[in-house]
A protein has these predicted regions:
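Von Willebrand factor
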Residues: 37-104, 113-156, 159-162, 189-204, 232
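Short beta-strand-loop
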Residues: 81-120, 199-210
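Second-shell loop/turn segments in exported
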Residues: 46-56, 88, 104, 120-131, ...
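Sec/Tat signal peptide C-region and signal peptidase I cleavage site
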Residues: 31-35
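Bacterial N-terminal signal peptides
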Residues: 16-28
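VWA/integrin I-like adhesion module and closely mimicked acidic/polar interface patches used
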Residues: 78, 165-210
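Von Willebrand factor A/integrin I-like adhesion domains
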Residues: 192-248
Length: 301
């Protein structure tokens, strides 16, 4: 015959987590929020996937970006920061309704994390696109940066835009540009000016200098051949991450109507490639024509 055992217990009501939180708040008690990730730089990369960019050109851009992040000098620039880490997110843009975030925030602090980032970028499928809304690229980039402030805190915030033509869809370029710059975000540009490509705008670097780039230390790196995209991205990243304004001044080689024309002094890439030229952002002949492509009904870019 089994004996029954009576166990004396005390009664403790079980409260749900939300109810516990409400009661703690009622009595002035709070639970500590998770600590935000501290980084030197929040960098958003915006890639044009409008109909003027064919699949091979986009592949060269994706591959070039991945290769640039794997470059030892880029990794070194990241590690030489005060915190030794940056955060990177990416998205594809064309017309505003077609824009798509392709990679959420990745923290880069060494070669292994750079390799993981590069693999993700290489494997990113193409987003279908139509026109070119650079204004919406700035707006989405700013949204990505600001919406992550509780989780990732950076001393500098940068949007980097790469495309092959002026704004021709979405909101006015000047309005989007000024709003983003007022938020303390720097915008740099990587315009593609390949005269063998479908979309070719010969003065796109000047357009970018006047209408797209902005904020302290902002600059434009022009790409004249898709095969040189990796070298241009590499130079841009080194300058962007280190933000060495002394290096920029010492590297000055000439001046154009758009402002100082600079060459970066960094280690040469393995394959011979023209040294990318860097144009500092500033007013020029395009300053009054930032929306030359129209608002959804101009150009073919």
């Amino acid at each position: 015959m089994k004996r029954s055992h009576t166990v004396k217990t005390s009664f403790y009501p079980v409260l749900s987590i939300p109810l516990c939180g409400a009661l703690l708040a009622l009595f002035g008690w709070t639970t500590p929020a998770p600590a935000a990730e501290q980084v030197d730089l929040k960098l958003v990369l915006a890639t044009d996937v409008s109909r003027s960019i064919d699949d091979e050109e986009l592949r060269l851009e994706r591959e070039g970006t991945a290769e640039a992040f794997l470059d030892p000098e880029v990794v070194k620039a990241i590690q030489n920061g005060s915190l030794g880490r940056i955060a990177v997110a990416t998205f594809d843009f064309s017309s505003p309704q077609d824009n798509r975030v392709t990679m959420d925030w990745h923290i880069i602090h060494d070669r292994a994390s750079a390799m993981a980032l590069a693999e993700t970028i290489r494997d990113t499928p193409r987003t279908p696109g139509r026109r070119t809304s650079v204004s919406s690229a700035l707006e989405l980039g700013a949204l990505l940066i600001e919406s992550s402030e509780k989780d990732i805190v950076a001393t500098r915030k940068v949007i980097d835009v790469s495309d092959d033509g002026p704004n021709n869809d979405g909101n006015r370029m000047t309005e989007a540009h000024d709003k983003v710059i007022a938020q303390g975000i720097v915008v740099n540009g990587l315009p593609v000016m390949d005269d063998n490509a479908n979309g070719y705008f010969p003065d796109l670097d000047k357009y970018y200098a006047a209408c797209v780039a902005g904020g302290r230390g902002s600059f434009v790196v022009a790409v004249h051949n898709y095969k040189d995209f990796s070298a241009a991205m590499r130079h841009k990243l080194i300058l962007e991450i280190s933000q060495n304004e002394t290096q920029i001044r010492h590297a000055q080689t000439g001046r154009t109507k758009s402002g100082p024309l600079l060459k970066l002094t960094a280690a040469a890439p393995a394959a011979p490639s023209p040294t990318p030229q860097v144009l500092r952002a500033g007013p020029n002949e395009f300053s009054s024509r930032c929306d030359i492509g129209g608002f959804g009904f101009g150009g073919g870019f």
